[in-house]
């Protein structure tokens, strides 16, 4: 499948053939989703979010017009790129639930503090395209600064795509993982 890019007057390009998933729909995920939609990087129709409660499903659907569910597996299965946006103490159980749905071409992006690329790779248990990010709280108002690092399976084009998504709610820079 080819990749089509559309350039908007914001200077951000949009990949039109991609589904973006979020496991977790709290404050940071909501800031990211809002920025991506507002900047036109991803349409609401192309965003899938899994959350723990039906109340959160309703909130995200009403607030952003995204597809929301309580099924983490459905988000991973239906997305090309998945943001892990949950609390660090929840991630091990979530990975165990969804790892069978992670295929070699999927990109997994973590916003979890304290969980290295190596740790994530070990938990998933198979070669996976992994990107680790560290967004900060000004992202909640579109002024964030996000540190980014990736494993060797992520191509330069894929890394640039993720940087484009992250820049929709502030700035993003590639840094060595030890600085994160």
Predicted regions, residues:
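Rossmann-like NAD(P)(H) cofactor-binding subdomain of soluble oxidoreductases
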Residues: 54, 63-64, 72-77, 81-148
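A structural micro-motif
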Residues: 18, 45, 66, 106, ...
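NAD(P)+-binding Rossmann beta1-loop-alpha1 motif at the extreme N-terminus of oxidoreductases
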Residues: 14-63, 67-70, 77, 143-144
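Hydrophobic packing within well-folded, soluble alpha/beta domains
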Residues: 20-22, 82, 109, 162
């Amino acid at each position: 499948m080819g990749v089509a890019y559309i350039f908007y007057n914001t200077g951000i390009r949009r990949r039109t053939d991609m589904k973006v998933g979020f496991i977790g729909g709290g404050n940071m995920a909501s800031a990211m989703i809002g920025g991506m939609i507002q900047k036109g990087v991803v349409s609401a129709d192309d965003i899938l979010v899994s959350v723990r409660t039906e109340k959160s499903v309703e909130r995200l659907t009403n607030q952003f017009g995204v597809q929301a569910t309580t099924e983490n597996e459905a988000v991973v299965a239906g997305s090309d790129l998945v943001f892990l946006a949950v609390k660090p103490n929840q991630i091990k159980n979530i990975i165990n639930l969804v790892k069978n749905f992670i295929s070699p071409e999927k990109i997994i992006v973590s916003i979890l503090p304290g969980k290295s690329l190596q740790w994530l790779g070990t938990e998933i248990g198979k070669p996976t395209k992994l990107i680790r990010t560290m967004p900060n709280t000004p992202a909640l108002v579109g002024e964030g600064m996000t540190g980014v690092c990736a494993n060797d399976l992520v191509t330069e084009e894929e890394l640039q795509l993720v940087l484009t998504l992250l820049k929709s709610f502030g700035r993003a820079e590639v840094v060595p993982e030890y600085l994160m």
